[in-house]
């Protein structure tokens, strides 16, 4: 799935769209997605000027965006002005290594549970095969009035 298709499934836009490509997707099960981290990211000038590091919360947000892509593709629907996926919870987050300009983050996210409109996931983010971040995520699909 290239960026043009991703834009059909996620409402996020620059500077908050954090998934560049989907490499693999098994609907209802798993997604493998990536984010190319460059020095041009808007957060690097302030985090940190002398040693740029991607904020951990944005790594987790990117993981959640990959999870949302998996959910929408699995349901066979595209979001519209009447639906949104909310990030509802994060558990057991661990940051194992810093992510810096030039890194390519690879997100591997699996659905562990789904009930009605609530989805739970287990996700990991790796750089060059090395674990950078892991987390358990909960998202809720909400239909707006």
UniProtKB/Swiss-Prot annotation:
One of its GO terms (molecular function) is (3R)-hydroxyacyl-[acyl-carrier-protein] dehydratase activity. Keywords: Cytoplasm, Lipid A biosynthesis, Lipid biosynthesis, Lipid metabolism, Lyase. Its EC number is 4.2.1.59. GO terms for biological process: fatty acid biosynthetic process; lipid A biosynthetic process. It catalyses: a (3R)-hydroxyacyl-[ACP] = a (2E)-enoyl-[ACP] + H2O. Belongs to the thioester dehydratase family. FabZ subfamily. This is 3-hydroxyacyl-[acyl-carrier-protein] dehydratase FabZ.
